[in-house]
Amino acid sequence: MRCTCQSLRKSVYIRAQSIWHSLPLRSQAKQKVKNAVFRLLISTVGWSPDYQRRQKADAGTDSFRGMEFETPTGLVPAIPEGTADKSCAPLLQAEALKNKPAKLICFYLPQFHTIPENNAWWGDGFTEWTNVKPARPQFAGHHQPHVPGELGYYNLCDPAVQRRQVELAKCFGIEGFCFYFYWFGGKRLLDAPIENYLNDRSLDLPFCLCWANENWSRRWDGLDSDILIAQKHCPEDDLAFISWISRYLDDRRYIRIKGKPLLLVYRPNLLPSAKETATRWRRWCRERGIGEIFLAYTQSFEKVDPTRYGFDAAVEFPPNNSAPPDITDQVEPLNNRFAGRVFDWRVFIERSRCYRKPSYKLFRGVCPSWDNTARRQHRSVVFLNSSPQGYLQWLSNAITDTCKRFSDPDERLVFINAWNEWAESAYLEPDLRHGYAYLEATRLALAASALTVQTEQSNPTNRQ
């Protein structure tokens, strides 16, 4: 009898799905109907796969609840009591990692201080925090706003902030920051934190630059819509740019690959001729005594062989360019204005278990989470179901894959998006919800991957 009921349910479910998909309604209208059905007919539809997925999404996937963590010596908890949720990982004590299997480099956003241009475009006192603080949930189970932990709503012009960032990064196994560098035909924006970092030799964490060579627009996406400040790409600008940043390339802390300073470009396809730009930069650096440079680009909008641009490598930049599964119809909007898109973050874990071997030099990238509601409000892009445990698995897989593909330690790089992209919910810095869980997951991933690599190296049959 039970089998008969289950078969009947399955048949009804399949038929209902077919009718549902054929309804001539817009997605928002269909979502309202589905929400009403789930709310009013729970006893009838509670067994359905759609309803079960909804419940799972609302409950979240935080696997760190109840876990114990060990963290580096010399740090003390600074999260106020009573402000963190039950999944918050405290800051305990443990020895710092040695002999790390790969170098982890975090993208670093410098927009946490005021500049005249932002004051004019967005209002007096604007920083990244201006968008982060008022962010609100857009659907059931949506976590907003994101509230910082021990570092607070910091100002990057405060030297103590960068010192603490460096301490945290080093203690949890991060090998370097990749600063976004904003250059518009000789006009530099948001460069005060980078200048301060360069001038303060006590900040001993290695660093490199990524030229964010897009236009700035009011949409926060680099597209040509209501441009605030535009790029001025030309041969003269190529030379002016490399001349200016040479002061960073010369610094002893600057990240190098086989002795070559590492320079990233966010979108080389926006250059009139990326190959010609690369040639100019390489020639200029040779003639000025810097020597050879290592050029890489982020796969933010494209996935092509870097040699097409005259570059040496590409860097994965999730969640961009990832074609994840869309689960927008599985969430329950909290207001009628919600027109965003929701994706399932867990797809990255699954894909990382069996990476495709690239045909060119590619550095893996991971992101702890992603949600740009702070910038786009009801038109945001949200990746649901991220968790510290899931991030740990993804990062571990990325490190293991990197060690298999690169024998030279200099090329064993994994990029993390990001250290402090708070308006995109992509950060490792401690917050009130998870505490130090993402930082601790980073350290655990390094430790787990080191053990995996050692085991495979000791067993020749596992080598590829």
Task: Describe each model-derived feature in a short phrase.
Residues M1-E81, L92:
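Membrane-proximal basic amphipathic "stem/tether" segments
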Residues G60-Q464:
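Glycan-processing catalytic domains of CAZymes
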